[in-house]
Regions:
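Acetyl-CoA-dependent GNAT
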Residues: 2, 6-80, 84-86, 97-99, ...
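Active-site acidic-Proline motif in GNAT/NAT acetyltransferases
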Residues: 84-86, 90, 122-123
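Conserved active-site alpha-helix within GNAT-family acetyltransferase domains
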Residues: 94, 104, 122-140
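Conserved beta-strand-loop-alpha-helix junction that forms the acyl-donor binding cleft
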Residues: 112-128, 144-149
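Terminal substrate-recognition subdomain of acyl/acetyltransferases
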Residues: 142-163
Length: 163
């Protein structure tokens, strides 16, 4: 079973994995975020649990950077999504990004938010196809990132929150 919980220090060891060079060039590893985990920041880090074991990670960010991705002041930016290589291909990431799991997360941690945005590097077609399969839509916006042009994708929960 897949669950999303706030990242905790006891998850660090399991989340201190490496990604293939191909994957690592497109995302920050979870360990990059660990030092600031308990600091008061405009973001929250989450662990993806599979059978109660931490196997993945992502950040939801309400900081200034999100304004580059959306004009919606209530949007949150999805960052640094990854799954431990030993658990890739099992559908864990897709389950983690399902409405069933993200909706309660937004309601609890970001109650005024109804949109999740992210950037996907144009060279990362696998991730682009994955996020579309999870229900994200291409906004037709693009952004120049550190490693090249990014397509901006959005997942809108406003209809779900009002129904």
């Amino acid at each position: 079973m897949v669950k999303i919980v706030e990242c905790q220090q006891q998850h660090f060891r399991a989340l201190s994995y490496s990604l293939s060079p191909e994957q690592a060039k497109f995302t920050a590893l979870p360990s990059v975020w660990f030092a600031d985990l308990n600091a008061k920041k405009p973001w929250k880090a989450f662990s993806i649990l599979f059978d109660d074991e931490p196997v993945g990670f992502f950040v939801l960010d309400q900081g200034e950077d999100r304004q580059k991705y959306s004009d919606n002041p209530q949007a949150v930016l999805l960052r640094s999504m990854s799954i431990h290589p030993d658990f890739q291909g099992l559908g864990i990431a897709k389950q983690a990004l399902s409405h069933q799991r993200l909706m309660p997360l937004l309601l609890h941690h970001f109650p005024s938010s109804h949109e999740i945005v992210l950037g996907v590097n144009h060279l990362n077609q696998r991730a682009y196809a994955f996020y579309l399969a999870c229900g994200f839509k291409h906004t037709q916006r693009e952004l120049m990132g550190i490693r090249g042009k990014q397509s901006i994708l959005s997942l809108d929960f406003s209809i779900c929150k009002h129904s």
